[in-house]
Amino acid sequence: ISPFFQKSLWKWWYQRLAKAHGRADFRFMNYGYKDGKELKLLKEDEPNRLFIQLYNMNIRDVDLKGKEVVEVGCGRGGGASWIAKTYNPKRLTAFDFSKDAIGLASNWYSSQKNLSFKVGNAEDLPLKDNSKDIIYNVESSHCYGNVEVFVKEVYRSLKAGGNFCWTDFRDKESIEKLHEIFLKTGFEIVSKKEITTEVLDALDDINDTKVKGINESVP
């Protein structure tokens, strides 16, 4: 399918999901991560442990405290909220192309002063050049019509020496192409890890409620 059609299809899917599922307990849209190491969490975050652990795995090697941070593809905001309160960035701005998801997240997390949610296009980020310390992206880029444009937008927006933390699902051929895009754009890959086993282990533990909710909301 064409990049435009692919992007439009994913946008429709996520918009429909956000509209149909305004439940406050359905705040994460990622698969989860389980590596046998128990991340220390507040009691209030325990129900979302596996989803939070994927976010933590993605950003745990960088220092976010006092930094200008961006999440691209934040969904319903659960991950951004947890990172903002746990790692204390100066400001975390979270973008998503679903205005309904952004509306939910903005309402749910309005009390977090270092966190904001905005509608935004990953392939045309509303950010100034060289303005952010860290940009991260969790299981979202497979929806984009042109991933190379997205990577270039991230590179443009990062300060010199900034970090891009990325995780998503890809087959062997497409991940090799993506690595080439990173390098061609100007990034240095300082660490990488395949986490298929850890994600599958998390999926085995995730309650069927999440899958049921998606199936009820999206035909």
Model-derived segments and their meaning:
Residues I1-F26:
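N-terminal auxiliary segments of SAM/dcSAM-dependent transferases
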Residues K34-I52:
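Class I SAM-dependent methyltransferase Rossmann-like catalytic core
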Residues N48-K65:
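Conserved alpha-helix/loop element of class I SAM-dependent methyltransferases that forms part
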Residues V70-V72, R76-D124:
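Class I SAM-dependent methyltransferase SAM/SAH-binding core
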Residues E123-I135:
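A short acidic, Gly/Pro-enriched loop at the edge of an enzyme's catalytic core
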Residues E148-A160:
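A short glycine-rich, Lys/Arg-flanked "PGG" loop and its adjoining helix->strand segment in the class I
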Residues G161-D168:
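Conserved beta-strand signature within the Rossmann-like core of class I S-adenosyl-L-methionine
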Residues E176-P219:
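Substrate-binding/catalytic lobe of Class I Rossmann-like enzymes that use SAM or dcSAM, i.e.
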